[in-house]
Curated annotation (Swiss-Prot):
The keyword Cell inner membrane does not apply. PANTHER family: 50S/60S RIBOSOMAL PROTEIN L16, LARGE RIBOSOMAL SUBUNIT PROTEIN UL16M. This is Large ribosomal subunit protein uL16. InterPro entries: Ribosomal_uL16, Ribosomal_uL16_bact-type, Ribosomal_uL16_CS, Ribosomal_uL16_dom, Ribosomal_uL16_sf. Keywords: Ribonucleoprotein, Ribosomal protein, RNA-binding, rRNA-binding, tRNA-binding. GO terms for biological process: translation. Binds 23S rRNA and is also seen to make contacts with the A and possibly P site tRNAs. Belongs to the universal ribosomal protein uL16 family. Part of the 50S ribosomal subunit. The keyword Calcium does not apply.
Amino acid sequence: MLSPKRVKFRKQQRGRMRGVATRGNTIAFGQFALQAQECGWITSRQIEASRRAMTRYVKRGGKIWIRIFPDKPVTMRAAETRMGSGKGNPEFWVAVIKPGRILFEMGGDEITPEIAKEAMRLAQYKLPVKTKFIQLDEQEKSAGAKAPAASEAITVES
């Protein structure tokens, strides 16, 4: 399971999840992706369960990229412990997810949209947040009006 090798501080405050994801909200590696629709915490166990579900479905067909990393420690107190005497010990690690964040990507020559959609659907069941399946061409259409693509170089003649 995923967890940081070492951290500067062992314990963190819980924090708030406000707004939408401004980073990690576009497809970077593959052709298909799973995008979060709401905010939440995803544990390292849930990430691993989703990864296993996808890899078992696609077998050796393509490549899967995990775009999130659980870097926030969640502490818990022992059961039946009285109040006080400090904060509990770190029990597990979570990734903080905001709406729009890309969770997983998938690509490869043998991966069709149908295979990718079914694999992502199996991964969706393992996650505690609502997600949607997106393709690279859909993303280009929505972002097409903002900036020209790299393949469409603008030439200026003088």
